[in-house]
Swiss-Prot record:
Name of protein: 4-diphosphocytidyl-2-C-methyl-D-erythritol kinase
Designated gene of the protein: ispE
Main function: Catalyzes the phosphorylation of the position 2 hydroxy group of 4-diphosphocytidyl-2C-methyl-D-erythritol.
E.C. number(s) listed in UniProt: 2.7.1.148
InterPro entries hit by this protein: GHMP_kinase_C_dom (IPR013750), GHMP_kinase_C_sf (IPR036554), GHMP_kinase_N_dom (IPR006204), IspE (IPR004424), Ribosomal_Su5_D2-typ_SF (IPR020568), Ribsml_uS5_D2-typ_fold_subgr (IPR014721)
Amino acid sequence: MITFPNAKINLGLNITEKRPDGYHNLETVFYPIPLEDALEITILNDSKQKFVLHQSGLEISGEPETNLVVKAYLLLEQEFQLPPVDIYLYKHIPSGAGLGGGSADAAFMLKLLNEKFNLHLADEKLEEYAAILGADCAFFIKNKPTFAEGIGNIFSPVDLSLKGYQLVLVKPDVFVSTRDAFSQIKPHYPDHSLKEIIRRPVSEWKNCMFNDFEKSVFPQYPVIEEIKKELYSKGAIYAAMSGSGSSVFGLFSPEEKITKMDFEAAFCFQTELK
């Protein structure tokens, strides 16, 4: 049984306050995009092992036990006594890009196990399991445009469609430490909530919807800021960094037929949003 975990982008990201536990409260809008990994599981005949992880595509660092798809399997295996499995993960979503690739893999693994082994878990229960694995993992259970607050784990639906818009996503060969990005942030409450801004026409977003991480990341990694500027110079009506970076995306008008763009970057993805 195979599934295709997809990435997300952040539309706006406001860091509103630092919490007593050391984490930060924020508000952002998660929007799913059709940049996908591939994930497959089969029954493992060698019952001496709980799982075997087969990885291909983009390189992933760390031991198999640290991979979120494995953590997702072990979480349900412990409760439902699942059989041993072969896990095949093909990575197309870059890591460390602010695209939620690892979180998507984990959430889709939960959904895949639920379907394959007839666990009959409702979405709400799957979201509870996903939240154990990571703050934004639960978003990928329903996988629809969502307003997120708290530490990125309190969700409410957003009536938003970017169907027809052209998306250009660029990730330079740069790794941004999320911890370092947070350390430079001065939390503040914005004048207008993203819940209100997201209802405005996309053509107005440039001047009112921001990613607070850009203030700390751009001075350290000028190449990321240059990509954002280049997207605007090529005609994007809105461009921003996703999450804490290092990827940057641009939205182009449905009326504008754009050709394939080239960037001096490690990764570039271009598609029409459906």
